[in-house]
């Protein structure tokens, strides 16, 4: 048996993500809510390697305004947005047309493409621990 690895250092999103043109406020549950103070704003996700899958689980009333900068989106659900990082620039949760729009980041995953495929095979779009056993 091998392991599925979440490569992101803060999978439960308990530390603030680098806001650009947004304010961050810590909630009672330890998560952060970000509110844009410009029309376009972003949460820059550091440590993403080209070719990896980044998955962001977030809550917002304006899901239509969000995308993943520097990524080819490969998955969308009512809570999760995932994409393959294919750039050398920013990897961010990007909000367009969102002055005053808020988002709470609940979890972040960073996976190899093979591990992401295995998660999908298990019927999962998410896993926020460090390691998870997987069938070979």
Where are these regions (language model features)?
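Extracellular polysaccharide-targeting segments
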Residues: 1-23, 32-36, 96-136
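Extracellular carbohydrate recognition and processing domains
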Residues: 59-63, 67-91, 98-103
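Low-complexity, intrinsically disordered short peptide segments enriched in small/polar/basic residues
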Residues: 1-4, 14, 42-45, 70-71
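Extra-cytoplasmic beta-strand recognition segments
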Residues: 13, 32-66, 83-87, 108
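Short secondary-structure junctions
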Residues: 22-26, 71-73
């Amino acid at each position: 048996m091998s392991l599925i690895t979440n490569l992101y250092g803060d999978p439960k999103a308990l530390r603030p993500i680098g806001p650009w043109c947004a304010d961050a406020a810590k909630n009672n549950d330890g998560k952060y809510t970000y509110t844009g103070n410009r029309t376009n704003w972003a949460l820059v996700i550091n440590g993403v390697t080209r070719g990896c899958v980044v998955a962001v689980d977030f809550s917002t009333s304006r899901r239509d305004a969000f995308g993943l900068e520097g990524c080819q989106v490969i998955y969308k659900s009512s809570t999760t947005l995932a994409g393959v990082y294919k750039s050398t620039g920013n990897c961010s949760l990007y909000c367009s047309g969102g002055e005053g729009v808020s988002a709470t980041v609940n979890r972040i995953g960073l996976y190899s493409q093979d591990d992401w495929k295995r998660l999908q095979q298990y019927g999962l779009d998410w896993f926020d621990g460090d390691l998870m056993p997987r069938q070979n």
